[in-house]
Design a protein with these regions (language model features):
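Cell-envelope/extracellular polymer assembly enzymes that use nucleotide-activated donors
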Residues: 1-3, 33
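Short, well-formed alpha-helical segments that are part of the catalytic scaffolds
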Residues: 11-26, 44
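Short beta-strand/loop segment that forms part of the nucleotide-sugar
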Residues: 30-41, 61-62
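A conserved acidic beta->alpha catalytic loop
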Residues: 38-47, 96-97
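Acceptor/aglycone-binding surface of glycosyltransferases and processive sugar-polymer synthases
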Residues: 64-65, 70-79, 91, 97-174, ...
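Short acidic donor-binding loop at the edge of a beta-strand
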Residues: 83-88
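Catalytic donor/gating beta->alpha subdomain of glycosyltransferases that bind UDP-sugars
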Residues: 164-223
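Membrane-embedded multi-pass helical conduit in multi-pass membrane proteins
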Residues: 222-278
Length: 278
């Protein structure tokens, strides 16, 4: 069995197109189920399922409040860990930027590497130059503070035995990609990040800053140690602590502390309002 998890907030038009693409690229031998996480959408769910002949089941988890995609994924994984004993999971976004044609390759890799999470790294991004530059800065800053090169997002596939590993320390409530890096073995594959089916990308500078802080926050102890190392290095090289650098390090750590203090605020609350079948 293969369960495809898709968080969605209002973008039902894109989701319908994505489901059609998934159906067209699914093998008839595979038992495919869709788990949609309705992240407290303002728009009423509208699904066109008439031509989805290869998808065996579509289940919608209606959340009781808006959580954002990362926490919506955490809710989905907590739900799935009690469903079946052995199956494969794919997590992807609903906007069309994750290539549904790449799913079969990822599942094949997951079957060969049951103890690993297959993550799809981006070959290229369909954004403007400024966002591409900001994304590179995000990758470099994240690496400098964590010594982890996290160049992938939600798009991933794995055997269900990895669910408990991903959920083991609650860091998934902060950033799914970091939780995967921290708690599991990963195998990388590469695919081009496509254009959104409809509308404009929500990625902007503020989004990337917030995203970076959440990713870094998962590795806070490592960030603290590296921050001290960089301070000592600057002191040794320049025989003094640079005040600007000191303030920057302090602000980064303060923001991270505030961010991680909120990461578990929802984990013990029943966040699934209703379960529907399409």
């Amino acid at each position: 069995m293969h369960v495809i998890v898709i968080p969605v907030y209002d973008d039902w038009k894109s989701l319908n197109k994505l489901l059609y693409e998934i159906n067209g690229n699914t093998s008839t031998k595979e038992l495919v189920k869709i788990l949609i996480i309705n992240d407290f959408s303002k728009k009423k769910p509208q699904l066109n399922i008439k031509k989805l002949n290869k998808i065996k089941e579509i289940k919608i988890l209606d959340l009781a409040k808006n959580l954002g995609s990362q926490r919506a994924i955490a809710v989905a994984l907590n739900y799935l860990k009690n469903v079946e004993s052995s199956f494969y999971v794919t997590i992807m976004d609903s906007d069309g930027e994750d290539d549904p044609k790449h799913i079969n390759k990822m599942i094949d890799l997951a079957k060969k590497n049951k103890n690993s999470v297959i993550v799809s790294c981006r070959k290229d991004r369909e954004e403007n130059l400024i966002i591409k530059i900001c994304y590179k800065i995000h990758l470099i800053l994240t690496f400098l503070l964590t010594v982890k090169w996290i160049s992938y997002g939600n798009f991933s596939s794995f055997h269900s035995k990895n669910i408990k590993k991903i959920l083991s320390d609650n860091s998934v409530w902060l950033a799914y990609s970091s939780a995967v890096m921290k708690n599991t073995k990963i195998k990388k594959t590469y695919s081009k990040r496509l254009k959104r089916y409809f509308g404009k990308s929500k990625v902007n500078f503020l989004f990337l800053v917030t995203h970076s802080i959440k990713i870094i926050g998962v590795f806070y102890k490592r960030v603290l140690v590296l921050s001290l190392f960089y301070l000592l290095l600057v002191n040794k090289l320049f025989n003094s602590f640079d005040s600007f650098f000191l303030i920057f390090i302090f602000i980064i750590n303060a923001i991270i502390v505030l961010t991680i203090s909120k990461k578990n605020s929802d984990k013990d609350v029943n966040l699934i309002k209703k379960i529907n079948y399409a």
